[in-house]
Design a protein with these regions (language model features):
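Residue-level detector of beta-strand face positions
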Residues: 59, 80-84, 232-236
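Accessory, usually C-terminal, subdomains that scaffold auxiliary metal cofactors
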Residues: 205-260
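Non-catalytic linker/capping segments at the edges of enzyme domains
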Residues: 1-27, 78-171
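Intrinsic-disorder/low-complexity, polar/charged segments enriched in Ser/Thr/Lys/Arg/Asp/Glu/Gln
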Residues: 23-27, 57, 154-158, 202, ...
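A mid-sequence, solvent-exposed acidic-amphipathic segment
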Residues: 142-208
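Short hinge/gating elements
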Residues: 32-36, 167-169
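Hydrophobic beta-strand-centered segment that forms part of the acyl-chain substrate-binding groove
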Residues: 34-38, 46-79, 180, 184-219, ...
Length: 260
């Protein structure tokens, strides 16, 4: 059965969440607002678009830079969701077998957050200053403004995030694609120095509960291991009570320069 077959949706509007069904398809676009590098979508945001049709924890592989402002097909066949067009397959999402049961650092303290904010690179030192999630050229109401700086006490990057009301869907909760986006960049800034230029190749996430706009969240990113050009990292989001809201693991791959 085909649901919403080739219906054009604005990038900020969710397609139908029918995770138990198969054979569904629609059309989405990644608006320029949701870019990572200058000419392609933010990896976490795009992963969230694909994962919306997966019930429960999901893993998303990013197969090619995701173009901006062009129609993309989103299709689910059995357990797999693909984002693609006539030129390429861009993302593949599937249910996650790994429960992500690894040890996570505790939430950052107020002092830690304050010190980390001071260490975050400014526009001249930022590798992708226009990024929707972490770009220093983006302001409130435009980007997520998650500036995960280095902790002075631990080998992690930490930041505070208070989601804005416009990130909410019809149910009043922050749309999960934005939680996926928030899980993206902090894991990069958690990579150990010297931190290479790298792009997200794969991300797996588990969302523990819905998030309400205005909640005060604390985000921690860290490197778990590295092998050659591959860096395995993770991100955890805690609420004010210290409970885990979302958790992810990510694969970053070093590159020499950003794609044109």
């Amino acid at each position: 059965m085909t649901v919403s077959s080739l219906v054009a949706l604005p990038s900020h509007v969710s397609g139908p969440r029918l995770a138990g069904m198969t054979g569904q398809s629609d059309e989405v676009q990644v608006h320029r607002r949701f870019r990572g590098p200058p000419t392609s979508g933010n990896g976490g945001y795009v992963a969230g678009l694909a994962a919306e049709w997966i019930e429960g924890p999901a893993q998303v592989s990013l197969l090619a830079p995701i173009p901006l402002e062009v129609p993309l097909h989103r299709r689910r066949d059995d357990a797999e969701v693909m984002l693609f067009d006539a030129q390429a397959n861009y993302a593949r999402a599937a249910p996650l077998d790994d429960p992500l049961n690894f040890e996570v650092p505790g939430p950052p303290t107020e002092d830690e957050l304050e010190a980390a904010a001071m260490s975050f690179p400014g526009p001249s030192g930022h590798p992708i200053p226009g990024c929707f999630v972490c770009g220093t050229e983006r302001g409130p109401g435009d980007g997520l403004c998650i500036f995960a700086g280095e902790s002075p006490h631990r080998d992690v990057a930490v930041a505070e995030w208070i989601p804005e009301a416009e990130l909410a869907g019809e149910d009043g909760h922050v749309e999960e694609r934005y939680l996926w986006a928030a899980l993206d960049c902090p894991s990069y800034f958690g990579l150990c120095e010297p931190r290479p230029l790298a792009l997200l190749a794969q991300i797996a996430a588990r969302i523990e509960r819905p998030v309400t706009p205005g909640e005060r969240l604390r985000i921690t990113g860290w490197e778990r291991s590295r092998e050659g050009r591959k860096h395995h990292a993770a991100t955890v989001i805690h609420d004010e009570a210290g409970e885990i809201v979302a958790l992810s693991k990510a694969l970053w791959v070093e590159i020499k320069e950003l794609p044109a």
